[in-house]
A protein has these predicted regions:
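N-terminal charged/capping segments associated with class I S-adenosyl-L-methionine
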Residues: 1-31, 119-121, 128, 385, ...
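Conserved beta-strand elements of beta-rich interaction domains across eukaryotes
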Residues: 13-16, 48-51, 92-94, 104-108, ...
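Short coil/turn segments at secondary-structure boundaries
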Residues: 20-25, 55-59, 112-116, 153-156, ...
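C-terminal single-pass membrane-anchor helix
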Residues: 388, 392-412
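Structured beta-strand-rich core segments of catalytic domains in phosphoester-bond hydrolases
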Residues: 49-159
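Beta-strand elements of modular eukaryotic interaction domains
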Residues: 31-35, 40, 86-91, 120-124, ...
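Catalytic lobes of large eukaryotic enzymes
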Residues: 75-83, 161, 165-394
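Core residues of folded domains in eukaryotic genome-function proteins
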Residues: 2-9, 38-42, 84, 95-97, ...
Length: 412
């Protein structure tokens, strides 16, 4: 079979609706110029998808944000090809979202979709977190008749000094991002189990063995994309650092060339020391940092004067790929980063010395932690969105009931 072509894009939306026209015009900027064919799968990882209250409440509160991103994909595709895509996955863990689209002729080969969510922000809530989707892709000549592709959207802890926290976030992903059951097929979009919990860390039943429920297992491709927040320095920049701020036109040997920053890149260091993202690889970085842009730069971008090509976000996957940033958009202080890659469809990938085992076992308490985080999210988000409070609502159950009632009639 021909390789499966993927286009994976990650973007921190800064809690704003995206500019559909501007985003669509540049959505495929990271695609190879000599490849006119549309990708088989498009994966969109978004962070700070919406204001925190809307993200925690989910449901209709997130519909405008996901709809605008879907419009971006549809418009970008229509500008290049006369073909349709099927939205297989639209899901989130708090403020982190994941969307998966399959080309219409490819969608029929996706036999099942499984999802998982985790929060590792404050008290394990979803202000920081990850959401994953696992697709079973039907193949010819493979022992099981399919291969699995796992996509994870993640937003890790910020700040230069928080390297250990980011490593702990990665460990949480391995231990508690648990896939449970097929919940959709290629013929329809994955929808949350119910509107009340769509923005939260959903609860449900478990099945199967742990070897296939975690993100690591044999005969599977794993891609992680997000605002991973690993920096190129262990300390925040000071005034004296302005002189060595990356220059696009600097010679590669010049200390001000962006490639010099990568010598102190935290993610590269932590991966080499087997402290984070065990067994993963990242395509070579050929673009300057994508964060953080000033308000003046965002205003310039709105007038078409912003930088045209800038890593705070990193799709992590196989080498031999096109890996680049998109222009700055006026709605965010981050720039989108995209990976265009083709993965081989092989009859079997035997477990050997190259197989990566899970660096940590699945947390046996993962479901209780997820359910607890769910309760922590919905009450404060209901307070922020509707003015609810414990003093007026009484018990937690009464608070939840009152928030649900208001959600049924409120229009965000």
């Amino acid at each position: 079979m021909n390789p499966l072509s993927l286009y994976i894009l990650t973007f921190n939306c800064a809690r704003n609706l995206v500019d559909v026209n501007r985003f669509a015009n540049h959505f495929f900027d990271a695609r190879p110029l000599n490849d006119p064919s549309p990708p088989d799968l498009i994966v969109l990882s978004v962070q700070e998808l919406a204001p925190i209250a809307y993200a925690f409440l989910g449901g209709s509160y997130l519909n405008p944000y996901f709809s605008s991103l879907k419009d971006v994909v549809n418009q970008a595709v229509a500008q290049r090809w006369d073909i349709d895509y099927v939205n297989l996955v639209t899901d989130n863990s708090g403020m982190t979202g994941l969307m998966v689209f399959a080309r219409s002729d490819v969608a029929e080969r996706v036999s099942s979709v499984d999802t998982a969510r985790i929060g590792f922000g404050f008290q394990e809530m979803g202000n920081k977190g990850a959401v994953g989707a696992r697709l079973a892709y039907a193949t010819e000549g493979t022992p099981d008749g399919s291969i699995d592709l796992t996509f994870v959207a993640a937003h890790l802890a910020p700040m230069e000094s928080a390297v250990e926290q980011r490593n702990d976030d990665w460990r949480s992903v391995v231990e508690r991002l648990v896939f449970e059951r097929p919940v959709a097929t290629a013929r329809g979009s994955l929808e949350p189990d119910d509107q009340e919990t769509s923005g939260l860390l959903h609860g449900s039943t478990s099945n199967g063995g742990d070897d296939r429920r975690g993100i690591f297992f044999s005969n599977s491709y794993l891609f992680i994309a997000g605002d991973l927040n690993y920096r190129t320095s262990n300390v925040s920049p000071g005034q004296e650092d302005l002189a060595r701020f990356p220059r696009l036109n600097a010679d590669p040997a010049d200390p001000r060339h962006y490639s010099q920053l990568l010598k102190d890149d935290q993610l590269t260091r932590e991966m080499r020391q087997s402290r984070s993202f065990h067994g993963m690889t990242e395509a070579p970085i050929g673009f300057p940092p994508t964060y953080k842009y000033t308000l003046a730069a965002q205003k310039a971008a709105a007038q078409g004067e912003g930088p045209r090509s800038g890593r705070g976000q990193a799709p992590v996957g196989p080498a031999g790929a096109t890996y680049d940033s998109l222009p700055l958009f006026p709605t965010s202080d981050h720039r989108a980063v995209a990976l265009s890659v083709a993965v081989p469809i092989v009859a079997s990938r035997p477990v050997d010395a190259t197989h990566v085992s899970a660096p940590f076992p699945i947390d046996p308490d993962w479901q209780r932690k997820r359910d607890t985080a769910r309760q922590r999210e919905i009450v404060p988000s209901g307070y922020w969105a509707h003015g609810s409070c414990f003093d007026r609502c009484g018990t937690l159950d009464e608070a939840l009931q009152r928030i649900r009632s208001r959600m049924e009639t409120a229009v965000p």
